[in-house]
Amino acid sequence: MDEDGLPIVGSGIDLTKVPPIQQKRTVAFLNQFVVHSVQFLNRFATVCEEKLSALSLRIQQIETTLNILEAKLSSIPGLEDVKVEAQHISESNISNGHLPSQPDAQSVVVSPQSDNNSMNDGILQKEEAKSENITTVSKDPRYARYLKMVQVGVPVMAIKNKMIAEGLNPDLLETPDAPVPDGEPEAEESSDSESSFSD
């Protein structure tokens, strides 16, 4: 015995005289543990399934939006030759965990207009040498606004339907450097329409 009256070695209890644990209580404890564990796992699985279904729905929405965007971009002529310079991220920024969320406007260079302008300049020079007085579709004010709509990304079918409603030839959208079928009257009509706006 030590100072507190406790045995130095062992508990001092004769284990042969201790009554056994009741089996019914042991079974009840085990059953309760199993039930709580199963309920927890069921709740966890349900929450995971809900989050995965929400994520799947969000991915489907993004895919649909991406398909619409690709369709709009494919309707713009001349984007096949667009060159985009990849943004170079320094390794120090990556190691520090600083990743830019959006590329800077200066780091990404998209030049569809410059490519289109260079191609159009060559074609325009040839056509100007052949005929200087012929009005092209791109110069005609009635067709120019529809060509601008195509460049902005408005769906081509909607533009063609609007052109048909206004009595214009929608096939001329694909050939902006072609001569206007009724050249001079269009210039007169456009000047009339401009004067009506100025009044």
Curated annotation (Swiss-Prot):
- Any signal peptide, and if so, which residues? none
Q: Region Disordered: start and end of each range?
A: 93-136, 170-199
What are the BP-aspect GO terms?
actin filament polymerization; exocytosis
InterPro entries recorded for this chain? WASHC3
A single GO cellular-component term from the record reads: WASH complex
Keyword set for this entry? Coiled coil
- PANTHER family on file: PROTEIN AD-016-RELATED (PTHR13015), WASH COMPLEX SUBUNIT 3 (PTHR13015:SF0)
Under what name is this protein listed? Answer: WASH complex subunit 3
| GN (gene name) | washc3
